[in-house]
Amino acid sequence: MKDAVIVSAVRTAVGKAPKGTLSIMRPDDMASVAIREALARAPGVSPADVDDVILGCAMPEGEQGLNVARIASLRAGVPIEASAVTVNRFCSSALACR
């Protein structure tokens, strides 16, 4: 890879924990929705074009496992050959990925 290009950034919805309306959604499923939307906002970019996914996640443990970026990217249709990394900066994780 010669050039790194950020094509899009999306934030997931925010809800009340642990009993809010989003509490029934798995974190990796929610993140995959954000990845699909990021791709939808980038004209001409398909999942096959993605070489790397960088995903901010404040609490990357629990049922989604410790590499939520990898699981979410696969669930979003990004090829298995693409890399993915989870950035944990707690409350500022999403900002660190921008």
Q: Which residues make up each language-model segment?
A:
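Loop-to-helix transition at the N-terminal end of transmembrane alpha-helices
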Residues: M30, V53-I54
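Condensing-enzyme catalytic core mediating Claisen C-C bond formation in acyl metabolism
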Residues: M1-P27
